[in-house]
Amino acid sequence: PQPEPDPEPVPQPLPEAGPLNALTGLPKAEGVAQDARPVAVMVANNDRALPQRGLAAADVLVEMLTEGGITRLMALYADMGSVPQVGPVRSTRDQFVQFALPLNSILAHIGSSVYARNLLDVTGADSIDGLYLGRTAYWFDEARSNPKPGGYLKEYCWFTDAALLAAGRDHLGIDPAGTVHTLFRFSDTPTPATGAATTVTLSFSGAAEAGFAYSADTGLYAKSIFGAPHTDEDGTPLQYTNLLLLNCNITLKPDGQVTEFDMTEGTGWYCTAGGVLPLIWQKGGPKDDLHLYLEDGTEVLVAPGKSYVAYLPAGRENAVVFG
C-alpha cells in the first residue's frame, strides 16, 4: 500500500505578545506598553542609497525585490518610541504591506505603488505616508543632498525618527495601541538544525545579493552587502540571531513592471546558531499570520532574538548557498 501523505497543517493562532517583544520574543524594554503596536519603515537599499541609518536597531529586517532587480528593505521596530533616525525612507509595495498587516503594524513610507495603495485602502491599514504628510513626519537632510561629489539624489535624503512618526501618527489620529501577536512561535529551545550554515549567500537577481557570516563568539549572523560588511552610517553592524529565507513565486503584475509576489505559501530555510533546517511556509491572505512548518506539519520553533527575513525568487539557480 502507498504511504498516506502528511495531512495539511492547520494553522494555530500565534500567541499574543503581552510582556514580550512581538518581533523578537524577548522581554519588552522597560516602560513599553504591552499593547504598543510595531512600526514598519521602508528603506532604500541600492548602492546609491548607502549608507543607511537606523537599521541595526530594527528588531526585524525584511528584504524583497522591487523593480529593476533591486531590493528594498522594511525595518520593523516593536514600538514607535524605539525608532532611531532611520532611512533613507522610500515608497512601499504590496508584498511588504502583506508582511506587516498581521502584526498590526503602523506603516511608514513615502509613496507607494498603486497596488500597495489599493491594499492599504481596502484593508484600512494605518499608514504614515510622507507623500501626503511631508515634513510633519519626515526630515530632509540638506547636507546629504549637496551636489556631487559626495552628494545624494533627493530621494535618498528623507529620514524619520520616533518623534516625527509620533507627530504623523497624532496628525492622522492613529491609535498607538492594539492587539499584537508574535511574529513567530518563539522558544528558548528552537527546532534543531539538520545541516550547517556558518556562511550564507543570497542572490535575489544579477544586481542584488546579500551575505551572512556566523560568529560563534556572538551567536549572530553578520550581514554583508555588495561584498562588504553591511553597517549603518555610524558603523554599527547589522547582526541577527535568525535568518528566514523564503522561496516565493515572483512574477510581474499586469502593468509589466511592478513585481507580483505569491505570498500564500512556499518552501524555505531557517538558520540559527550556525545551523540550517528546511521548512514549508504558509501565510494565506494579506492579513493572515506567517506560519513555518517542518515537512511533517510540526510548527518550527524560532530562537528569541532579531531576525532577517528574505523572500527569494523560487527556482532561481543558486539563490541560496550555504557554507
Regions flagged by a language model, labelled:
Residues 6-58, 67-323:
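A surface/extracellular/periplasmic glyco- and lipid-processing/surface-interacting theme
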